[in-house]
Swiss-Prot record:
Residues 241-261, 385-402 have a biased composition (Basic and acidic residues). Residues 241-292, 302-321, 363-402 are annotated as: Disordered. Component of the 19S regulatory particle (RP/PA700) base subcomplex of the 26S proteasome. The 26S proteasome is composed of a core protease (CP), known as the 20S proteasome, capped at one or both ends by the 19S regulatory particle (RP/PA700). The RP/PA700 complex is composed of at least 17 different subunits in two subcomplexes, the base and the lid, which form the portions proximal and distal to the 20S proteolytic core, respectively. Interacts with PI4KG4. It comes from Oryza sativa subsp. japonica (Rice). Gene3D superfamilies: 1.10.287.3990, von Willebrand factor, type A domain. InterPro entries: PSMD4 (IPR027040), PSMD4_RAZUL-like (IPR049590), UIM_dom (IPR003903), VWF_A (IPR002035), vWFA_dom_sf (IPR036465). This is 26S proteasome non-ATPase regulatory subunit 4 homolog. Belongs to the proteasome subunit S5A family. It holds the Pfam family VWA_2. Plays a role in maintaining the structural integrity of the 19S regulatory particle (RP), subcomplex of the 26S proteasome. Plays a major role in both the direct and indirect recognition of ubiquitinated substrates of ubiquitin/26S proteasome-mediated proteolysis (UPP). Binds and presumably selects ubiquitin-conjugates for destruction.
Length: 402
């Protein structure tokens, strides 16, 4: 890759207002300048490019040789068109700018766009060419626009004077449908002395056409704020779309869950309905069994009524017998009293036997014979038994006395 420092001379004279090159001569020239600047900076990172004008209020350097492509492209905006181009003065100023380049190892090159008539004589141009050759400065000329009889001859003489080892080139571009930049892509002015590579050519073309190779079609070197704003806007839009897609997915999953829940509820209702129907069927089968049970209960009730009526009749008969025979009634009463007294005496004897009572209490569930309350109860019963014995003993002597 050739290491170069290049100065591009732009023709911004009144002749650039014509529209024989689409959209105008000046705009076509600006597109071609952008193309060449991109090609130079892309072919070698250390290459530098400067831009200057040849008309207007005078020759003026817009940008000194630099590798900042954004700065180079930005200087093309807002240029004024007017007056006449001064080719000789422009070449001399460009030579001085290249002489003061920072990297002295860079080769020097001047590219001049000439779209207006050339007013200088051939001898003057040859003198300028020899001076460039002496200082090892290469010259490329793009001839377009006005075509008088002397212009091509003068420019050819200039290139012949400066040419050394075919390092200088001239390209004549007639008016036509093809853009000026499209014609220059296939020329040595664009590809360089080594012919260039396809990668460098495509990258340079993308960079020079203003943004074809940049994201959002905006060169961040020219307008970094706009490029950042577009990038942020794109990220926000992407995040918004992702949020919408996520929400839609959640809603669809929620609807599926609701459908599943409703189907499960329906299944549970069906499951509950089946036992209910089975219970109804069981109830239909139960009336026969219930009727049999009712009949049995009625029979038992009748038998109990008969038994109670028989007992009542027996009691009535006994009552009548008692009335008829008072002596028998008195005997019965005395026997009952004797039986009651004997039973009470028997019960008192049983409670007097503490070992027997303790064994009975041990056999009862949940009863503790050692409980204080149980002991107090047994003691009270035992005391009552002893008191009854004393009363019986006291009653016997009185009976004997009688």
């Amino acid at each position: 890759m050739v290491l170069e420092a290049t100065m591009i001379c732009i023709d911004n004279s009144e002749w650039m207002r014509n529209g024989d090159y689409s959209p105008s001569r000046f705009q076509a020239q600006a597109d071609a300048v952008n193309l060449i600047c991109g090609a130079k900076t892309q072919s070698n990172p250390e290459n530098t490019v400067g831009v200057m004008t040849m008309a207007g209020k005078g020759v003026r350097v817009l940008v000194t040789p630099t590798s900042d492509l954004g700065k180079i492209l930005a200087c093309m905006h807002g240029l004024e068109v007017g007056a006449e181009a001064n080719l000789a003065a422009a070449i001399q100023v460009a030579q001085l700018a290249l002489k003061h380049r920072q990297n002295k190892r860079q080769q020097q090159r001047i590219i001049a766009f000439i779209g207006s008539p050339v007013k200088y004589d051939k001898k003057v141009l040859e003198t300028i060419g020899k001076k460039l050759k002496k200082n090892n400065v290469a010259l490329d000329i793009v001839d377009f626009g006005e075509t008088d009889d002397d212009k091509p001859e003068k420019l050819e003489a200039l290139i012949s004077a400066v040419n050394s080892s075919d390092s200088s080139h001239i390209v004549h571009v007639p008016p036509g449908e093809n853009a000026l930049s499209d014609v220059l892509i296939s020329t040595p002015i664009f590809t360089g002395e080594e012919g260039g590579s396809g990668f460098a050519a495509s990258a340079a073309a993308a960079a020079a056409t203003g943004a074809a190779g940049f994201e959002f079609d905006v060169d961040p070197n020219v307008d970094p704020e706009l490029a950042l704003a577009l990038r942020l806007s794109m990220e926000e839009e992407r995040a918004r779309q992702e949020a919408i897609a996520k929400k839609a997915a959640e809603e669809s999953s929620g609807a599926e869950n609701k459908d599943h829940a409703s189907s499960s509820n329906a299944d549970s209702v069906m499951a509950e309905a089946e036992p209910a129907s089975n219970a109804a069927d069981d109830k239909k089968d139960q009336p026969k069994e219930d009727d049999d049970a009712q009949l049995l209960q009625q029979a038992l009730a009748m038998s109990m009524e008969e038994g109670s009526s028989g007992a009542a009749a027996a009691d009535a008969a006994m009552a009548e017998a008692a009335v008829d025979d008072q002596d028998l009634a008195l005997a019965l009463q005395m026997s009952v009293q004797d039986a009651g007294g004997s039973s009470q005496s028997d019960m008192s004897k049983v409670f007097e036997d503490r070992s027997f009572v303790t064994s009975i209490l041990n056999s009862l569930p949940g009863v503790d014979p050692n409980d204080p309350s149980v002991k107090d109860l047994l003691a009270s019963l035992h005391g009552q038994g002893e008191q009854e014995k004393k009363e019986d003993k006291s009653d016997k002597p009185e009976d004997e006395k009688k």
